[in-house]
Amino acid sequence: MSHDSDDKTFPYQKDDAELRRRLTPMQYEVTQHAATERAFTGEYTDTEDAGIYKCVVCSTPLFESGAKFHSGCGWPSYFKPLNGEVIDEKIDYSHGMVRVEVRCNHCGAHLGHVFEDGPRDKTGLRYCINSAALNFESRPENE
């Protein structure tokens, strides 16, 4: 699934040649062609450090470490984004399923999917995000 067929225009317009130079092949395939990294292989699956997870394409802050939880699914999971403005959601009919795709609302990079099986005492949502779509910026707990 390529985002080229999507009608939505995002504020950050990325140059494909520049992205191919700057991103790893996995980062490029995940963010630009909605690929999925293999479960339990991502850099941030088990990260517990305090900080902010940002879009690997445009550096938009997306998730705080305080919203991260261990879901056991094999990908970093969060019960909410940093705020309601940073995420774009789109129905995804690929692979014979109906899911909700999660994209960066600034550049349109594919991040992962959101499911309704997250912590019930929080939002009930599980944002299942590819590590390859993220960069982590460590921050002290008290910031």
Curated annotation (Swiss-Prot):
Entry's Gene Ontology BP terms: protein repair; response to oxidative stress
Transmembrane segments: none
Necessary cofactors: Zn(2+)
Note on how the cofactor is bound: Binds 1 zinc ion per subunit. The zinc ion is important for the structural integrity of the protein.
Substrates-to-products reaction catalysed: L-methionyl-[protein] + [thioredoxin]-disulfide + H2O = L-methionyl-(R)-S-oxide-[protein] + [thioredoxin]-dithiol
Alphabetic keyword roster: Metal-binding, Oxidoreductase, Zinc
Highest rank taxon of the organism: Bacteria
PROSITE patterns the UniProt entry points to: MSRB (PS51790)
Catalytic residue positions: C128 (nucleophile)
GO MF annotation list: peptide-methionine (R)-S-oxide reductase activity; zinc ion binding
Disulfide bonds: none
Record-given protein name: Peptide methionine sulfoxide reductase MsrB
Species name: Burkholderia cenocepacia (strain ATCC BAA-245 / DSM 16553 / LMG 16656 / NCTC 13227 / J2315 / CF5610) (Burkholderia cepacia (strain J2315))
